[in-house]
Amino acid sequence: MKSFRKIILGLKQFVSQIVRPNIRPGRMFLGAIVFIIVVILGLAYAFVGNKNKIISVKVGENIFRAEVAETMAQKAKGLSYRDSLDKDSAMYFDFGQEGGQGFWMMGMRFPIDIIWIKNNVIVGIEKNVPAPTPGTPESALKLYYPPEAIDKVLEINAGLSDELGIKVGDYFSIVN
């Protein structure tokens, strides 16, 4: 969003320079066209450029279309502020190194299963993690931690790990 604000400030300066009484109408029209193009590109970046990359992952014998949380901002947001997740969809976090990353349900609107992964093997599953009651202060949110150091996490719809028979010891892999 900061880059979008910079674009808007730049556009304000640009418009203030082109809206002068001594500018010919042709240049003013050209300036307006450039302004419109820049605004459209800025909006396109804001709404399309921030989409998460989609990959296919395999957990046991099950394939999911997983959104990849790559940046720190994407990892912090996760599935927050969404109303649902398709049954065959997931959110994938790759931390690059082992650690005890904690997860919370801030802004979540639906329950999930959190699958803890270490070296491409499931080492734990936090099942049916509930969405918090709206208005719950951040300080009151429960933190969920893996049973041991992990390097990856997969979030899926609540109950799906039981329904699909996903269990500790199953293998995880990226299909594409």
Give names to the regions the model predicted.
Residues 27-37:
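Hydrophobic H-region at the start of alpha-helical membrane spans
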Residues 1-28:
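N-terminal Lys/Arg-rich, disordered targeting/topogenic segments
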Residues 2, 29, 40-176:
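Compact, glycine-rich, soluble single-domain proteins
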